[in-house]
């Protein structure tokens, strides 16, 4: 889990898969196919299998997706960053809450902050406009949250307009 709270970093496992396929599978099959003089079909099949394995490794890389800012997947990434930021700067959030006592937050966010397990399911169903309101309502949104959200979305291969 990354410190932004967005989940598993798929980039690392993808690189390992590609390296494994390229280093272990492809050269052995290619050399075997090229040195086997008895069956031309084996040569073509083995080469095709090696190429398919490399293509599968490349296809396993995270695809990029353009989503609406109100898409629930975008909201979950934003809320994951927000929960992680609250955990990292709890005193600052307490001071902000004390200065703005009428500012309300969904109860699911408070539960996620203090539950250090998988909080993703707790945060589903919060309306997009409420997510935007609570995240952009803090003074450090543009300096701390927006860059972290942008980075987290990018790591997940998600591109969208982020509220300014």
Swiss-Prot record:
Could you tell me which species this protein originates from? Saccharomyces cerevisiae (strain ATCC 204508 / S288c)
MF terms in GO: structural constituent of cell wall
One Gene Ontology cellular component term attached to this UniProt record is:
fungal-type cell wall
Name of the gene: PAU21
| InterPro entries found in the cross-reference section | SRP1_TIP1, Yeast_SRP1/TIP1_CWP
Please give the name of this protein: Seripauperin-21
Tell me which domain of life the UniProt entry assigns to the organism this sequence originates from. Eukaryota
**Family statement drawn from the similarity comment of this UniProt entry:** Belongs to the SRP1/TIP1 family. Seripauperin subfamily.
What is one Gene Ontology biological process annotated in the Swiss-Prot or TrEMBL record?
A: fungal-type cell wall organization
